[in-house]
From Swiss-Prot:
Transfers and isomerizes the ribose moiety from AdoMet to the 7-aminomethyl group of 7-deazaguanine (preQ1-tRNA) to give epoxyqueuosine (oQ-tRNA). The gene is queA. This is S-adenosylmethionine:tRNA ribosyltransferase-isomerase. GO terms for molecular function: S-adenosylmethionine:tRNA ribosyltransferase-isomerase activity. Belongs to the QueA family. Its EC number is 2.4.99.17. It is found in: Cytoplasm. Keywords: Cytoplasm, Queuosine biosynthesis, S-adenosyl-L-methionine, Transferase. Its main location: cytoplasm. It catalyses: 7-aminomethyl-7-carbaguanosine(34) in tRNA + S-adenosyl-L-methionine = epoxyqueuosine(34) in tRNA + adenine + L-methionine + 2 H(+). GO terms for biological process: queuosine biosynthetic process; tRNA wobble guanine modification. It is an enzyme of class 2 (transferase).
Amino acid sequence: MKEFDLESYDYYLPKELIASYPVLPKEKAKLLVYERRSQKITHTTFEHVLDFFPKNALIVLNDTKVIKARLFGSKHAFLPSKTTEVFFHRFFKNNTALTQIKGKIKVGDKIFFDANYHAEVLELLHNGQRLIAFYDNKTPLNQENILKLLEQYGHMPLPPYIKRADESLDAHEYQSVFAKHMGAVAAPTASLHFSQNTLEKLLKDFKHAFLTLHVGAGTFLSVETKDIREHQIHTEVLRIPKKSQEILQKSQEILCVGTTALRSVEYFKRLENPNQEAFECDIFLHFANPILHVNYLLTNFHLPKSSLLMLVSTMIGLEKTKEIYKTAIEKKYRFYSYGDGMLIL
């Protein structure tokens, strides 16, 4: 079936449509609304997004907060040039961290961030990740202090298709206005469209629930297997508070703000009698594992051959997805993280 063929999810995108900066004010970003029942497409802007939200739907939002995950250091304590990049992925056991480090590296190597702080490479993992520990002189840092180090010395982890260094505006624009729990290394991008004013109106007028999926670096990876069913998707840390779990269990109609919220809901709703708040989410949604519990989705426009494009295709069909993306390109919609959005009803 073509739905399982990786090449079915390829498309050409002119480079000028890859958004390098956000639209400001946020409400001026374009929004494509697609109503599946009537197959009607409406072109509007985010200042009208809540007008299209179904009144009885539960709105689910991901309140993860992006950390400054990119660090630059030197392999020698007294060298002023910091040319070794460390990309923090997530915490591991005993206050260690999973990272990617550019360039040649071996176990025992140290990377210095200033006169006091450094990291030591503990293990080279098979998937290209490096297990490291952070230190203040000879004292190991705990998770709280590692986050403080990242906040002080780190850079916002802009996606690889944004071909510029991070700037001061990214510290707040590559972060949703309701971001709360630190841990993501990529923003849940549909959330970026909400201004404080739009959020307050949503919280006042709609049933809503928050969850936290710490978006991992794997979100940018293309699927590589010719048959998409053979793809092993990345695992991400998910937390759903008991209050949100209760609301989700009772709700019949759900609208997710972003694919991360949708994947979280689908993962949770398939569990039998969940009795905890913390999970490891590794759900991959495609035509052989379709969406079962979410009715509507607000999302951005996604990369070719990405698992997120496959997710969207399961909601509206492969051919309709291609047709809508073609329309968006013709109408000069801006794509990817800082781009415009699409509401599927």
